[in-house]
């Protein structure tokens, strides 16, 4: 039965956390409505408080009806419902991705306010299949092709207990219990590649890859035997003699849904058993992240890891140091990896960061470029600045705001600054790093640079911590 499968999944995913409350994202579609009813039964059995969250993206007339419907269901189940609104600001460029990020920002911020650690979402088996196909078309590596049932966003655990349940079973459950749901009309549009894949697979047809590029990456042919063998399970290479039926099907660009699911499971197993442990070891051994918002990568230790893991480490550092939520594309990271192999010092920019080789180490620090971080007024006790630093004030400080240090301000207070600790830690790159740190100003005057313990008055007291909103399916930075 459906509930038994759901219960087994969620108990395995959550483990023995001893949670007293949990949240759930519900849109009004069949997937999330089914999840709501299943989660409600489970929450009642385990005496857990369930909070229902809906996000209106303000893009469709029907969305207001959907939110109202979910509110009514929540009330009937005696569950608290929260309706959030995404402001697209009439900017429709890259809207799907921005709406997704905005939705997760809203939901996880609410979870933090409510002191909730876990958010359930209704990603089901068909979603995983579609994602695999889309990533295959983008020529993703093994990390990109893998999927995870537990993710992190804004330090909230995102759990997907429907991962092995097809949409058809969820719809059947709703029909059997006479439960209404809404269909998003945009799901039937051929405008989005995901919809084309979905419609084809729903009819039982094979998935045909959308492009004809060869998908085996030249740069991985010289990798270790272990990672090459692992890679050929995902990418075809007939010369190895290990190509599976799926690999041969992929070679002619054709895969059945069952074959995709099988391949996804193989990929996930490889990631979980081999590549993920290697990635965690690589970060522990080769990476040092400092409270000043920069990092060093030990290139001697870095060299022993597989190429796929090397790409992930570089992206891990770029995301954390830049404060961005998305990883750089492989084709952007590849030139950096090639430069590293040349064993010469260099200085490059990528993904909002400066990447500088100093002998056997790689220094990565923030680059503002033409787009400076937004100044933040310290109205509340604390504020997040540049998506990286949390600044907390320990006293009432009127009209102060957080910003970056300009060259003009630096010249004024330069002689009063003790930069020796930062100079030593950053291999004499202290001036560049200093300009990326948060400072507190009142009007035009710098009153504090907490990182280097600079205060123009003994009455000021601010705390600062490096707290990037890091999102990864493989590692968690907290």
Swiss-Prot record:
<feature type="binding site">
    <location>
        <begin position="27"/>
        <end position="32"/>
    </location>
    <ligand>
        <name>ATP</name>
    </ligand>
</feature>
<dbReference type="GO" id="GO:0032267">
    <property type="term" value="F:tRNA(Ile)-lysidine synthase activity"/>
</dbReference>
<dbReference type="GO" id="GO:0005524">
    <property type="term" value="F:ATP binding"/>
</dbReference>
<keyword id="KW-0547">Nucleotide-binding</keyword>
<keyword id="KW-0067">ATP-binding</keyword>
<comment type="function">
    <text>Ligates lysine onto the cytidine present at position 34 of the AUA codon-specific tRNA(Ile) that contains the anticodon CAU, in an ATP-dependent manner. Cytidine is converted to lysidine, thus changing the amino acid specificity of the tRNA from methionine to isoleucine.</text>
</comment>
<dbReference type="Pfam" id="PF01171">
    <property type="entry name" value="ATP_bind_3"/>
</dbReference>
<keyword id="KW-0436">Ligase</keyword>
<comment type="similarity">
    <text>Belongs to the tRNA(Ile)-lysidine synthase family.</text>
</comment>
<keyword id="KW-0819">tRNA processing</keyword>
<dbReference type="InterPro" id="IPR011063">
    <property type="entry name" value="TilS/TtcA_N"/>
</dbReference>
<dbReference type="InterPro" id="IPR012094">
    <property type="entry name" value="tRNA_Ile_lys_synt"/>
</dbReference>
<dbReference type="InterPro" id="IPR012795">
    <property type="entry name" value="tRNA_Ile_lys_synt_N"/>
</dbReference>
<protein>
    <recommendedName>
        <fullName>tRNA(Ile)-lysidine synthase</fullName>
        <ecNumber>6.3.4.19</ecNumber>
    </recommendedName>
</protein>
<dbReference type="GO" id="GO:0006400">
    <property type="term" value="P:tRNA modification"/>
</dbReference>
<keyword id="KW-0963">Cytoplasm</keyword>
<dbReference type="InterPro" id="IPR005728">
    <property type="entry name" value="RPE1"/>
</dbReference>
<dbReference type="InterPro" id="IPR014729">
    <property type="entry name" value="Rossmann-like_a/b/a_fold"/>
</dbReference>
<dbReference type="GO" id="GO:0005737">
    <property type="term" value="C:cytoplasm"/>
</dbReference>
